[in-house]
């Protein structure tokens, strides 16, 4: 072999080996960058800007992935059988197939009927004639507390109502049924009803409902159903506008007992709907937590600002155990209706045998401020919490069941609201009805600041358990013959042409069970 040949061999070797190796490394790097675009969070390009990191607050349990085994056919059959079993007018809360459900079921015939979920603001009315004469149908009304069943929303969309299922899925009737539930949107015109034409255990396919048959009032969504499925309400403002919804802030803690060294306070950020508060109460029951004081309203904006909870004052004798005096709730956790909460843990300071210091720790007073990040100078809510050892927490106070109150038929309610709303020069409007119901001038002035004073006073009449005959008499004595005529026309349309009678706290209309608001 010549010297020239022997000198070329190393360079040839480098070309043969180096080029494939370099190509493989370059290909691997390209694949890595490509995967970053499709799998956000797994890796990051070196030149990408760092994303802001929020304070280290543990994610709530609802954010953790759940691996649930696929249900078998017998399990699915047993699930729906239990869900549609008549509950004898009771509202049942139960964990079924990894879902926390609140439901009621009954049988209805040609006379119709009504299903109500207690303390949630949810009802389903099956009108007379919706079922063929001689047949009986089992129907169910379900509040779904499984947050994974809610629609997948963008940052511009907010969840403002519960997810409600009417069953059996796909059931249809001769006449439309009326589903009613509460929402917390500040502008009803920005809220839209959604439906998922799927069963409760299937993957959901949420789509907006059209306007016909859907009516969204100031705090209520009413849908005329041609068939049964899943329903909810979503808030989305037009471009250039800001969407807002009402929150209720609820504080919970366990009893403060002698010798207890620590106390945890939890603040829930909930949609301002009855069922959201019931969820928090149910969530606290296993831990012995009870609500402290009334809920406070909060004007929450969809401007993508996180919610801050800042500790401002702790009474003497107690100290904050947490590393920080402020907590942060991600905006979308609230905007998408995930019912998040944040907590502070407090510890008694050592008394050192000082009776005066020990007496100070028998009571704890806490003040907190909550606001959206960056908006502290514009809007802050102040939360005050107080607990003491002297309170009787050992035995829960007896729960007095409020008396049943009649609810005016929706179409009549709206007609009377429209007639009574305009202010009359003589005061012969909703204000006169308020006076007849015993309200003083100060309360009437307060009602005048409401979005619909007429609706508020009609709801008060419902809570006083008044009958249609009593309302007809009041309108006649007020010389509001237009309202009296509207009531009389409704009574004349009732079966057999006879007026409704009040019986046992419900409207008895010859077999038609109208809605009862608890």
Curated annotation (Swiss-Prot):
GO terms for molecular function: netrin receptor activity; peptidase activity. It comes from the Eukaryota. Residues 208-235 are annotated as: Peptidase S68. One of its GO terms (biological process) is positive regulation of canonical NF-kappaB signal transduction. The chain crosses the membrane at residues 11-31. Pfam families: Death (PF00531), UPA (PF17217), ZU5 (PF00791). Coiled coil: none annotated. It is a single-pass type III membrane protein. Its main location: membrane. The active site is at 227, 229. Residues 102-237 form the ZU5 domain. It is found in: Membrane; Cytoplasm. Keywords: Cytoplasm, Membrane, Transmembrane, Transmembrane helix. Inhibits NF-kappa-B-dependent transcription by impairing NF-kappa-B binding to its targets. Belongs to the unc-5 family. Interacts with p65/RELA and NFKB1. This is UNC5C-like protein. It comes from Mus musculus (Mouse). The gene is Unc5cl.
